[in-house]
UniProtKB/Swiss-Prot annotation:
It comes from Thermobifida fusca (strain YX). Keywords: Cytoplasm, DNA-binding, Repeat, Transcription, Transcription regulation. It comes from the Bacteria. Belongs to the MraZ family. NCBIfam families: division/cell wall cluster transcriptional repressor MraZ. GO terms for molecular function: DNA-binding transcription factor activity; transcription cis-regulatory region binding. GO terms for biological process: negative regulation of DNA-templated transcription initiation. GO terms for cellular component: cytoplasm; nucleoid. InterPro entries: MraZ, MraZ_C, MraZ_dom, MraZ_N, MraZ_sf, SpoVT-AbrB_dom, SpoVT-AbrB_sf. This is Transcriptional regulator MraZ. It is found in: Cytoplasm, Nucleoid.
Length: 143
């Protein structure tokens, strides 16, 4: 499970150090792809394969399934962390997420998300009130 917030930096080659506590889970490979709200999703290869199976079972006759699958898979990039724990973020994905030097990596249960630092700060500030309001709707009777 991926938890927490980290602030790695992109180097001039578009590489970033993955947080050390996640490296074992990602050592076998990972997939980086477009996420919602202009962030990037980082999946361990097994989780990406599970999602692939779910999408494979969805009806290709449904336009929404075709549209989502095209964007999701066309932007996906298989990556393997180097010996130092760095992963390269492809230029097209850096551009999509507006990534420059300062980034934020958040744990989001089964995936990591990579955000531009300012975009994340803005999103988090905007969502703080919504977070409080949605607790009962999202987790009824739990919290």
């Amino acid at each position: 499970m991926f938890l927490g917030t980290h602030s790695p930096r992109l180097d001039e080659k578009g590489r970033m150090f993955l947080p050390a506590k996640y490296r074992d889970e990602l050592a076998g490979g990972l997939v980086v792809t477009k996420g919602q709200e202009r962030c990037l999703y980082v999946f361990p290869i097994r989780e990406f394969e599970r999602i692939t199976q779910v999408l494979r079972a969805a009806p290709v006759t449904a336009k929404a399934v075709r549209d989502y699958s095209r964007v999701f898979f066309a932007s996906a990039s298989n990556e393997l962390p180097d010996r130092q724990g760095r992963v390269t973020i492809p230029a097209n994905l850096r551009a999509y997420a507006g990534l420059n030097r300062d980034c934020v990596v958040i744990g989001a249960n089964t995936r990591l998300e990579i955000w531009d630092a300012q975009t994340w700060a803005d999103y988090e500030a905007e969502q703080e009130q919504v977070f409080a309001e949605l607790a009962e709707e999202v987790l009824p009777g739990v919290l």
